Regions:
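Sec-dependent N-terminal signal peptides
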Residues: 1-9
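Feature marking well-ordered beta-strand scaffolds used for ligand recognition
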Residues: 9-207
Length: 207
């Protein structure tokens, strides 16, 4: 278990603390897990000032492999596909794509422009609230936004295809009837929490 701070003031129910990594000068925002081809387990931790990747194969001895400093933000969301981590933030850095094959932390990209599947359009994204990646290699970007001077992107769901290129995803479509705060996909259905509308929507994404 990884915590931005540790408190031992009360007992846990059926749980024992095995180890932790302390981040004394920042705060934790999000966490995601990833397993490499050898079965080693990693925690990918979103922090206010970047992203930390920690080897937790031995949970009693977690080992931070690298840290990527990034623009300060109170929000990051992380998902993985194959050997890459994808990080959204509400600051204007695009989507951070990290190559997890390189445990030095030196191989990553901030991607802001996504070419459509028919090559007729390019979608520009500076910030996004959340993302979800389904097992078929399609990423769903939720709550995207751009600063003044850029065209507003769809702030519902933006769909990216990661299959052809993990570091250069293709823009394949969007649903933009309402702002989506969070969502998930199972089979051909997107389950979307449209917080400002006060409703959940179930959207057919089969095509």
């Amino acid at each position: 278990l990884l915590f931005p701070f540790i408190s031992f003031s009360q007992d846990s129910l059926n749980m024992s603390l095995l180890g932790y990594v302390d981040y004394p000068n920042t705060n934790g925002i999000d966490i995601w897990g990833w397993v490499d081809s050898s079965g080693n387990e990693f925690a990918i931790v979103g922090l206010r000032d970047g992203v930390s990747v920690v080897d937790v194969t031995d949970p009693s001895n977690p080992d931070e492999k690298f840290f990527i400093a990034d623009i300060y933000s109170v929000w990051r969301d992380i998902k993985t596909w194959n050997n890459y981590a994808y990080v959204t933030t509400e600051s204007d850095t695009g989507i951070l794509i990290i190559d997890l094959n390189d445990m030095t932390g030196s191989t990553y990209w901030h991607v802001k422009d996504f070419i459509s599947y028919n090559l007729n359009d390019t979608l520009h994204i500076e910030a996004a609230h959340n993302l979800f990646i389904y097992e078929n290699g399609y990423a769903y970007i939720f709550g995207a936004s751009n600063p003044p001077g850029y065209a507003a992107p769809p702030n519902g769901a933006i769909i990216l295809d990661l299959n052809a290129s993990s570091i250069n995803p293709t823009y394949v479509g969007n649903w933009n009837s309402h702002y989506i705060h969070d969502g998930m996909v199972r089979n051909d259905t997107l389950w979307a929490a449209c917080v400002y509308y006060g409703s959940a929507f179930f959207i057919d994404v089969s095509d």
